[in-house]
Amino acid sequence: VFLPVSRKSPEAVSLKSEKVTARGGSEVILVVEDNRYVLDLITEVLGSLGYTLLKARSGEEAMDICASHTGGIDLVVADVVLPGMDGPAVVKNLLKDYPGMKILYITGYPGEVVSLYGISDTEMHLLQKPFSASALTEKVREVLDEPPGHVL
């Protein structure tokens, strides 16, 4: 049995209180995170930088949102471990409709658990929880600024 590093809200509290200096943008970002508190804080931080946010608490909800969303999606920030459809399954399905979409995985689980989902921090963008607002915003900007088709 694997348990996440932490599911408590203190990991996200630093997101709200920290001053962010990263450059924002106008891109559309879908955030898929089952912890409502963490989801709200991530979208609050990214929204304050001008990004357009779509948010989902499950893989199934993410698929429904994308089915009704009429524009493009530039980035998906997805928790690796979600109830029902996990983050990698969501991404695999979304890439069929949005092939140029960029991906940033987030997780509170250790590397050996994440690797069971086919995720490697040397091959994909991965941000380990807890993370600061600066770490989040800098990583989001880094991923968005990569050239199309870039693979780690």
How should each PLM-predicted stretch be described?
Residues 79:
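Active-site residues of response regulator receiver
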